[in-house]
Amino acid sequence: MLTLTRQQQRQNIRWLLCLSVLMLLALLLSLCAGEQWISPGDWFTPRGELFVWQIRLPRMLAVLLVGAALAISGAVMQALFENPLAEPGLLGVSNGAGVGLIAAVLLGQGQLPNWALGLCAIAGALIITLILLRFARRHLSTSRLLLAGVALGIICSALMTWAIYFSTSVDLRQLMYWMMGGFGGVDWRQSWLMLALIPVLLWICCQSRPMNMLALGEISARQLGLPMWFWRNVLVAATGWMVGVSVALAGAIGFIGLVIPHILRLCGLTDHRVLLPGCALAGASALLLADIVARLALAAAELPIGVVTATLGAPVFIWLLLKAGR
């Protein structure tokens, strides 16, 4: 038994090391790749100072943090709701951020600065989170809370569709592209949004013990003494914050929160002491690679990163499911 435990620990360490190396390679490639390839030896030239440090570095940091936040949010939701299909958009938080953004554009008549739009997106996500917490205070079961989130997401999606359909504003129509996900407008002015993600990410990565209890199921977690009401509220609030900030930075990006945790579980990473940091590393790496493809696929334009993640990730996910089912 002890030998099996040590073998599992060594395998977990190897996985984390491999994911760390993959993320470092993706970081280097993200800084080098673009319309002009800039090798590391040219990073401190005048051309490198402009393209690498002023344009590519803030974008790379945003992609890294958003990828980690979405993947960890997916892992948290899948444990909280005991559902492998749970993901950050499931509770309606992503759509709530979109409603906040569209409301800001309508009320501000397209004159609000980007930082104000970002704040409105976060506010929309937090409003949906507060509504969910209101439901949670009534001590609803996990399945009922999940259904409440799905219903809120449908309502927010309908509101966005109505607003965009009847709008004649060019800015509002351009938001449809933004809601498909993209990091094209990210620079150092959005650094406050990046900093807002770091404390929550680090805190959740340290909560492996309650997450392992939640993964056993609601009844087992209660029997082990876990205060379900407290942890449900805290985790829903933390997830709402991370998703709201991520949508404010890059729009709605699918696939990462759904598939990354599931892929790691198929690979044998079930302990949240390893799964949570593994999700952060794998989510960051996957989104960095998708961002590179989005930048380089077309010569005169940039693809929405949400389209890239779905196109590249869905076949891989299906292949892994078929492989696991054999």
Curated annotation (Swiss-Prot):
Pfam families: FecCD. CDD domains: TM_ABC_iron-siderophores_like (cd06550). The chain crosses the membrane at residues 15-35, 61-81, 88-108, 112-132, 146-166, 184-204, 240-260, 274-294, 302-322. InterPro entries: ABC_BtuC-like, ABC_transptr_BtuC, ABC_transptr_permease_BtuC. One of its GO terms (cellular component) is plasma membrane. The keyword Signal does not apply. It is found in: Cell inner membrane. Keywords: Cell inner membrane, Cell membrane, Membrane, Transmembrane, Transmembrane helix, Transport. It is a multi-pass membrane protein. GO terms for biological process: cobalamin transport. Its main location: membrane. Part of the ABC transporter complex BtuCDF involved in vitamin B12 import. Involved in the translocation of the substrate across the membrane. NCBIfam families: PRK03784.1. The complex is composed of two ATP-binding proteins (BtuD), two transmembrane proteins (BtuC) and a solute-binding protein (BtuF). This is Vitamin B12 import system permease protein BtuC. It comes from Shigella flexneri serotype 5b (strain 8401).
